[in-house]
From Swiss-Prot:
Lineage of producing organism: Viruses, Riboviria, Orthornavirae, Negarnaviricota, Polyploviricotina
Enzyme class label: transferase
PROSITE patterns, A to Z: RDRP_SSRNA_NEG_SEG (PS50525)
Annotated gene: PB1
Gene3D superfamilies assigned: 6.10.140.720
Protein name as it appears in the record: RNA-directed RNA polymerase catalytic subunit
Length: 753
């Protein structure tokens, strides 16, 4: 039946039709090759925004540094990073005046967290700059390498397992005259392959000891490695993002913990909450402004955009903020928190891989590493690159560029939000002392500003005052990219507000479909995505039913598991037909075994195995849920797993789904080729860590016990826990005397080892 498409919209309010404007089908763009050019752009731009600042030289590393703080007041509308210290401090003071006790309470909360955080907090996170190998590594490996080298250099505070003690080692390492590190190198040699008789390149990995003097070590400790940000839509040019090393990470974590605690108490902050909670918080601010703008008052909202937010922020300002926020706190706490901004004021940006040159005529390719850019003849480069290199040359040391101003992407999101909110806070009538007043929302660099005034001139004056106030703290509202509307219609962090936040379902579209993990997980994730969108994004019942049918179809095509009675021929149809004919209760077969789909929008919350369990033949149940099935290598069985789903905008989101482990929850084996490369040792390390952590979790399931606080090694903690558990089990009669004695003996043996 042909449907006239306009009929679909007869009952839909126009703002809900936003989901039909989805432009992002297809894959997002990924970056290839080197990020060196983008990083140089960032460094040069950041210095340009602060060019009228004062130049100094770092006495330890010899790096030239530009300090724009308290620089000239802006005379034009160009973006600039000249924040005024006294203005920032005053904004903080007013923020505290409007929220009595906010800083004090957040400091107390943070202090408690600082004393309890374990060093394994730093294993979270993805790629991390590993200063020992001078390249990126998984976070857990980078941390392990750092600790290993600290210990071999006599820094042992970290053995307590507390993050704060590891940070003591970091501080001490910076005072050492030299650090001895173990670094990897590759040997390549040509050998003849026995099987194919061809010549192949064999790589062996060697380890060698290397001494770093104080200067070289400091440069590495202060280095942020840079990469190109992938999968950014709607941009013509790529941009660089930074990944800091282990020395900086712990300090940043504590600063962000404090800032997060403050943001939670600020109604204008869009962080750290998300989703529906965020929408509710924001809707409150809008409601407040609309109710207070009586009939005589106008209310306008700016959907704001800031120019190069983090390139105009300055770590020195963050230091001033922290100094103010923690002013009545113990000395040790103030010191720990001030180290991150100090390290960022002295940071170095690693330029990445360098440039690749190729000669078409001679079919030659050669890589010019970043280290060589300082003194290579520029005649080989095109005009654009020449200019970049000339500009950055005075800043280069060992292939890294000195970058004192600016923050690099994504480092202090929470703290910079506090700064933004402090300016929004100044919009109250008691501070503006005139007829206009403002309020708004801030989430990292994204903001919405609501201005109320008796007439249009007042609105204009209010916006101007906000704009100028921002300039004083290094925030540059872009006049070109911000637009103003009557309050009631605006956009903030990709939420569209029109008399309430409009459910915008198109953002989630890329996450509908088959994930490609395995048959079991994919089915579970697929129905969970549909369920979540019905709850959160106004996905209506009819559309959800359709999405479900499309998903099942997609799933069957992906895994070639069409129903046993279908005519479609695939590689699997012979086996599936045979199974179909042998099965008495066909409704009990999983969709991935050629069974029928029993899902509808009412039972999406039930895992498929549970939904069909009662309908299954007994022998099918036995095959399906058999941990001894030799064909399946099982993960640890968790009741809940996490999947990564990709919305159209913003970062990948983690989504929980129910995991019932069956013989369909297989894990593909790791690619063999990695085992022959330099990464092999890293893999083995990672597996060892994984095993240790799993074992530890077995002894201390998070539900029953707070993590052991205090100074003991993992082994000691596990042994003492085993003894306590054994005693309880023995006294309550759950285990016999012999078993109890045996456990105690094992514990003693382990201790002696």
């Amino acid at each position: 039946m042909d449907v006239n498409p306009t009929l679909l919209f007869l009952k839909v309010p126009v703002q809900n039709a936003i989901s039909t404007t989805f432009p992002y089908t297809g894959d997002p763009p990924y970056s290839h090759g080197t990020g060196t050019g983008y990083t140089m752009d960032t460094v040069n731009r950041t210095h340009q925004y602060s060019e009228k600042g004062k130049w100094t030289t770092n006495t330890e590393t010899g790096a030239p540094q530009l300090n724009p703080i308290d620089g000239p007041l802006p005379e034009d509308n160009e973006p600039s990073g000249y924040a005024q210290t006294d203005c920032v401090l005053e904004a903080m003071a007013f923020l505290e005046e409007s929220h009595p006790g906010i800083f004090e309470n957040s400091c107390l909360e943070t202090m408690e967290i600082v004393q309890q955080t374990r060093v394994d907090k730093l294993t979270q996170g993805r790629q991390t700059y590993d200063w020992t190998l001078n390249r990126n590594q998984p976070a857990a490996t980078a941390l392990a390498n750092t600790i290993e080298i600290f210990r071999s250099n006599g820094l042992t505070a970290n053995e307590s397992g507390r993050l704060i003690d590891f940070l003591k080692d970091v501080m001490e390492s910076m005072d050492k005259e030299e650090m001895e590190i173990t670094t990897h190198f590759q040997r390549k040699r040509r050998v003849r392959d026995n099987m194919t008789k061809k010549m192949v390149t064999q790589r062996t990995i060697g380890k060698k000891k290397q001494r770093l003097n104080k200067k070289s070590y400091l440069i590495r400790a202060l280095t942020l490695n840079t990469m190109t940000k992938d999968a950014e839509r709607g941009k013509l040019k790529r941009r660089a993002i930074a990944t800091p090393g282990m020395q900086i990470r712990g300090f940043v974590y504590f600063v962000e913990t404090l800032a997060r605690s403050i943001c939670e108490k600020l109604e204008q902050s869009g962080l750290p909450v998300g989703g529906n909670e965020k929408k509710a918080k924001l809707a409150n601010v809008v409601r407040k402004m609309m109710t207070n703008s009586q009939d005589t008052e106008l209310s306008f909202t700016i959907t704001g955009d800031n120019t190069k937010w983090n390139e105009n922020q300055n770590p020195r300002m963050f230091l001033a903020m922290i100094t103010y926020i923690t002013r009545n706190q113990p000395e040790w706490f103030r010191n720990v928190l001030s180290i991150a901004p100090i390290m960022f004021s002295n940071k170095m940006a690693r330029l990445g891989k360098g440039y690749m040159f190729e000669s078409k005529s001679m079919k030659l390719r050669t890589q010019i590493p970043a280290e060589m850019l300082a003194n290579i003849d520029l005649k080989y480069f095109n005009e654009l690159t020449k200019k970049k290199i000339e500009k950055i040359r005075p800043l280069l040391i060992d292939g890294t560029a000195s970058l004192s101003p600016g923050m690099m992407m994504g480092m202090f999101n929470m703290l910079s939000t506090v700064l933004g909110v402090s300016i929004l806070n100044l919009g109250q009538k008691r501070y503006t002392k005139t007829t206009y007043w403002w309020d708004g929302l801030q989430s990292s660099d994204d903001f919405a500003l609501i201005v109320n005034a008796p007439n249009h001139e007042g609105i204009q004056a209010g916006v101007d005052r906000f704009y100028r106030t921002c300039k004083l703290v290094g925030i540059n509202m872009s006049k070109k990219k911000s637009y103003i509307n009557r309050t009631g219609t605006f956009e903030f962090t990709s939420f569209f507000y029109r008399y309430g936040f409009v459910a915008n379902f198109r953002m989630e579209l890329p996450s509908f479909g088959v994930s490609g993990i395995n048959e079991s997980a994919d089915m579970s994730i697929g129905v969970t995505v549909i369920k979540n969108n019905m709850i959160n994004n106004d996905l209506g019942p009819a559309t959800a039913q359709m999405a479900l049918q499309l998903f099942i179809k997609d799933y069957r095509y992906t895994y070639r598991c069409h129903r046993g009675d279908t005519q479609i021929q695939t590689r699997r149809s012979f086996e599936l037909k045979k199974l179909w004919e042998q099965t008495r209760s066909k409704a009990g077969l999983l969709v991935s075994d050629g069974g029928p789909n029993l899902y509808n929008i009412r039972n999406l919350h039930i895992p498929e195995v549970c939904l069909k369990w009662e309908l299954m033949d007994e022998d099918y149940q036995g095959r399906l849920c058999n941990p001894l099935n030799p064909f399946v290598s099982h993960k640890e069985i968790e009741s809940v797993n996490n999947a990564v789903v990709m919305p159209a905008h913003g970062p990948a989101k983690s989504m929980e789904y129910d995991a019932v482990a069956t013989t369909h929850s297989w894990i593909p084996k790791r690619n063999r080729s990695i085992l022959n490369t330099s990464q092999r040792g890293i893999l083995e390390d990672e597996q060892m860590y994984q095993k240790c952590c799993n074992l530890f979790e077995k002894f201390f399931p998070s539900s029953s016990y707070r993590r052991p606080v205090g100074i003991s090694s993992m082994v000691e903690a596990m042994v003492s826990r085993a003894r306590i558990d054994a005693r309880i089990d023995f006294e309550s009669g759950r285990i016999k005397k012999e078993e109890f004695a045996e456990i105690m003996k094992i514990c003693s043996t382990i201790e002696e080892l």
